[in-house]
């Protein structure tokens, strides 16, 4: 058990028959009445976000999440196959389950598979990935307006905005948390 006064961003807790990750929290001490903790939680099974208020000092159960380093191998129809780097066991996850992560997954990529009591509840990608541009309009010499962008499609099929100087075949560093262009590799 952990006190809500000890909340930290990224902490996983078990509340209301769900596994939740603390996204944001705020200790509130009103002039009248007792203090409380207002928190924003993400359900790790469904991805739903919920705001919940706890009384100060209230105890909640901390969920022990197991992280395993795995390597993405290949897509098999609607399923995606990952291999545990230590035991070489293979795990299949459906495309519905992966959702946003599919934009960045490529063969041999290392990811963290999160599980709770034997049930897989999440895939954590590296903070950045390097992907090759497969399709974009050519950059025109002299086209140097400040902050101008164009769209580019990378090898996974994901489309993002990039600066005008990026060409087909370039390898880009992409932020996986918001899908934005960082630099050329």
From Swiss-Prot:
This protein's record includes keyword Protein biosynthesis: yes
SMART domains documented for this protein: EFP (SM01185), Elong-fact-P_C (SM00841)
GO CC annotation, single: cytoplasm
Location within or outside the cell: Cytoplasm
One biological process term in Gene Ontology: peptide biosynthetic process
InterPro entries to which the protein is assigned, alphabetical: Elong-fact-P_C (IPR015365), NA-bd_OB-fold (IPR012340), Rib_uL2_dom2 (IPR014722), Transl_elong_fac_P/YeiP (IPR020599), Transl_elong_KOW-like (IPR013185), Transl_elong_P/YeiP_cen (IPR001059), Transl_elong_P/YeiP_CS (IPR013852), Transl_elongation_fac_P (IPR011768)
Entry keyword annotation includes Transmembrane helix: no
Keywords: Cytoplasm, Elongation factor, Protein biosynthesis
Pathway field: Protein biosynthesis; polypeptide chain elongation
Record-level Gene Ontology MF annotations: translation elongation factor activity
Cited Pfam families: EFP (PF01132), EFP_N (PF08207), Elong-fact-P_C (PF09285)
Role summary: Involved in peptide bond synthesis. Stimulates efficient translation and peptide-bond synthesis on native or reconstituted 70S ribosomes in vitro. Probably functions indirectly by altering the affinity of the ribosome for aminoacyl-tRNA, thus increasing their reactivity as acceptors for peptidyl transferase.
Record family assignment: Belongs to the elongation factor P family.
Protein name: Elongation factor P
Source organism per UniProt: Staphylococcus haemolyticus (strain JCSC1435)
């Amino acid at each position: 058990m952990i006190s809500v006064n000890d909340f930290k961003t990224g902490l996983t807790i078990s509340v209301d028959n769900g596994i939740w990750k603390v996204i944001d929290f705020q200790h509130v001490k009103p002039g009248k009445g007792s203090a409380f903790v207002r928190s924003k939680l993400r359900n790790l099974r469904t991805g739903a976000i919920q705001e919940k208020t706890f009384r100060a000092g209230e105890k909640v159960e901390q969920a022990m999440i197991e992280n395993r380093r795995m390597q993405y191998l290949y897509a098999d129809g609607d399923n995606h196959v990952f291999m545990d780097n230590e035991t070489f066991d293979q795990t299949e996850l459906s495309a519905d389950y992966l959702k946003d992560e599919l934009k960045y997954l490529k063969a041999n990529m290392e990811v963290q598979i999160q599980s709770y009591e034997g049930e897989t509840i999440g895939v954590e990608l590296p903070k950045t990935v390097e992907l090759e541009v497969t399709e974009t309009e050519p950059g025109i010499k002299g086209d140097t307006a400040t902050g101008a962008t164009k769209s580019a499609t990378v090898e996974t099929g994901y489309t993002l905005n990039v600066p005008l100087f990026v060409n087909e075949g370039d390898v880009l560093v992409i932020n996986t948390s918001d899908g934005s262009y960082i630099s050329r590799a």
